[in-house]
């Protein structure tokens, strides 16, 4: 990618044709002569390479499929031609739900755009529609930062958020893998996560597990962390975790793609707890174990 391409977004969304695409996604209007609206067969469409969503809830997809069976697809998906096929820029959930509904073809807005515009559009569309969980959104913002060398201010303008919001979101990527998994699965909220950033290493993971076990509010979490910090590492009120156990906990979380808690007893006995938030997530964990 050239420096001109890397700085492309700094010139504004219009330079990538994204203003027109956003309009098409919102109301399916045809922005210019390069845009075409037609029905495409399901099998000539493929998922977008730049889809930032890592999880799609099966129950929500089935609900959407039921809606499509009853009313059809009201809003076309947006695709771009890739060889003899079409790659999804926006609307992968609709495409997958259409397959569940038994449709053979779907309405699509076809727009020939560059890789640069495709990745940016996929990220922006998902962020603006709030389709992403906090970690997916942070990872998407990081890609805009890394792949296009955008500033936090440019990203904020592109996705319609404040600069502070973008910066705080990106900071979530510094969380431990197991803590990020807990946030993704809804066991922690953004307030808890921001407070946990004040801790590092296994202490952060310990605190996250205490938050869940005691059902602490964000304010209670902040007080706990402030107390730990003021008391120092020797505080009798702070539980300890063996660093080797903490490393194993992080390793298992990475391998399983889920938050893992290890509670190791004094006599060698303990518990291994794998956290999941839906039957779909459990199925994914079992697939990795098999």
From Swiss-Prot:
Annotated gene: parB
Protein purpose: Involved in chromosome partition. Localize to both poles of the predivisional cell following completion of DNA replication. Binds to the DNA origin of replication.
Family label: Belongs to the ParB family.
Annotated NCBIfam families: parB_part
Annotated protein name in UniProt: Probable chromosome-partitioning protein ParB
CDD domains cross-referenced by the UniProt entry: SPO0J_N
Gene3D superfamilies recorded: 1.10.10.2830, 3.90.1530.30
UniProt entry keywords in alphabetical sequence: Chromosome partition, DNA-binding
PANTHER family cross-referenced by the UniProt entry: CHROMOSOME-PARTITIONING PROTEIN PARB-RELATED (PTHR33375:SF1)
